[in-house]
């Protein structure tokens, strides 16, 4: 949306590149939006409006029920029926540390998803500017996960094709929603497919795309370097442009229950 807005006001040159990570812009048959209707959306919006936010645990439950066999019933059997402790898994532990979502943001995202508004030029607006994804011409790097249950990779592929970028690089990682991104080099099980988005059908794209072993991170790093403005010295202190740090790390929010 920001890229489309900058293009509409004549400031697209402020973007050297655009990166979309497990991002669904076309909500048709994808994620939560495909599982609810208008009435259910209004109920969800009303519930978050009462408190002023959507609790992070409630949001995590929504995503868990998109994949109930692995993320719900598996733990019911293991923890409750068999009385075992779940095996430690750092990625899922990090995933459980969810955050709250302001009610206004929740309302906007739900309505945008139910109506699939981003696929319609002018379907949503930003700072008074109608959003048209087709006007986004910035070079784009898109990453999706082949086993992603939240952002299905086919939907990510369709979303990339909504943009007007002349140069797009689509990467399909051999992992799910989180592990597709938390994918450091050196994993012998990791692999990815890569190619342009000229092919209309995502499954045909997958069959023809180049396959590589290991992580996609080095590929992304090289792609960014080609479009960047060289390396810059890291700041010696946090903050800047009139914004000072709020408090020392890790902050107070991480201690809230």
Per-range role (PLM):
Residues 147-151, 177-179:
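Acidic catalytic loop of the alpha/beta-hydrolase fold
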Residues 95-131, 138:
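Mobile cap/lid helix-loop segments that gate and shape the active-site cleft of serine hydrolases
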Residues 110, 159, 220:
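Hydrophobic, well-ordered secondary-structure elements that form the walls
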Residues 152-162, 174:
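Short alpha-helix in the alpha/beta-hydrolase fold that links the catalytic acid
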Residues 136, 142-144, 148:
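Short beta-strand/loop motif that positions the catalytic acidic residue
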Residues 169-257:
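Catalytic active-site module of serine/aspartate enzymes centered on a nucleophile-bearing elbow/loop
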Residues 4-108, 225-257:
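Alpha/beta-hydrolase-fold enzymes
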